[in-house]
Amino acid sequence: MTPSRRLLLVHAHPDDETINNGATMARYVAEGAQVTLLTCTLGEEGEVLVPELELLAAEHADQLGGYRIGELRAAMEALGVADWRFLGGPGRYRDSGMMGTPANDEPRAFWNADLDEAVAHAVAVVREVRPQVVVTYDENGGYGHPDHIQAHRVAMRAVDAAADPAYRPDLGGAWEVAKVYWCCVPRSVLRQGIEALAALGEESPFASLDDVDDLPFAVPDELVAAAVDGRAHARRKDAAMRAHATQITVDGPFFALSNNLGQEVLGTEYYRLVRGERGTADGWEDDLFAGLPG
């Protein structure tokens, strides 16, 4: 029997889903919803934080992508997510690296993907899963990574195309997604996290900025539509983050990426609603399915 609530998340690399939405995913799995993750690349260009695994990196053996499939599998087991896939199949699109790096020019880089082809792959998933809710990044990909921007483009175009009966009927019956959310962090929450790091004597990764308003992924609180409380599933998110060991170092309530600067692990995760109707007239929603039937 198909679960009545179905959530699809579209992300660029393994680990993005856990950092942005791990608590949300674990919560909805626990509540009996269908949670599907669609990851667009294997994350081949990521920096390796584990010294004994450094030779996996792109500049050495270039085997990191395959290793990260295993990390993603372990993370999904930690979150309880059974349905996780790669856009077009594992390795169809390669990690494009950070903006302005030589990896951007790789022919297989996701940044260079044929958008029509990539959208068709995503539409096939949307029409199969038939999610009421889709989660992805904003138009800047959160912080400007080429693959995040491309994941946004593919997800948003796929939502439109999947609803059009005239578009590729061979990919399944048309399906209209009721709500689309973009991942975000409210400015007030970022300020609190920076203050918490400072209280511990830790340097914030954003210390050089005059104000959190300058951060591309920090949004005014009034633009936030939902705050999903997943604190009851914090241990699952913590375990999933630890599963991505080549990319993330976890230390108590904080984590670090390759910059080795601490960020707070959020048990409550935040979203902007960009398609569909809010489920509550006042304040932030506490449920991405708020206002939907069933």
Curated annotation (Swiss-Prot):
Cofactor: Zn(2+)
Binding site for Zn(2+): H13, D16, H148
The protein's Enzyme Commission number: 3.5.1.103
Top EC category: hydrolase
Protein's GO biological process: mycothiol biosynthetic process
Cofactor details (free text): Binds 1 zinc ion per subunit.
Entry keyword set: Hydrolase, Metal-binding, Zinc
One Pfam family recorded for the sequence: PIG-L
Keyword RNA-binding among record annotations: no
Keyword Zinc: yes
GO molecular function annotations of the record: N-acetylglucosaminylinositol deacetylase activity; zinc ion binding
Cited SUPFAM superfamilies: LmbE-like (SSF102588)
Record field: catalytic activity: 1D-myo-inositol 2-acetamido-2-deoxy-alpha-D-glucopyranoside + H2O = 1D-myo-inositol 2-amino-2-deoxy-alpha-D-glucopyranoside + acetate
Job description of the protein: Catalyzes the deacetylation of 1D-myo-inositol 2-acetamido-2-deoxy-alpha-D-glucopyranoside (GlcNAc-Ins) in the mycothiol biosynthesis pathway.
UniProt family annotation: Belongs to the MshB deacetylase family.
Protein name: 1D-myo-inositol 2-acetamido-2-deoxy-alpha-D-glucopyranoside deacetylase
Gene it is expressed from: mshB
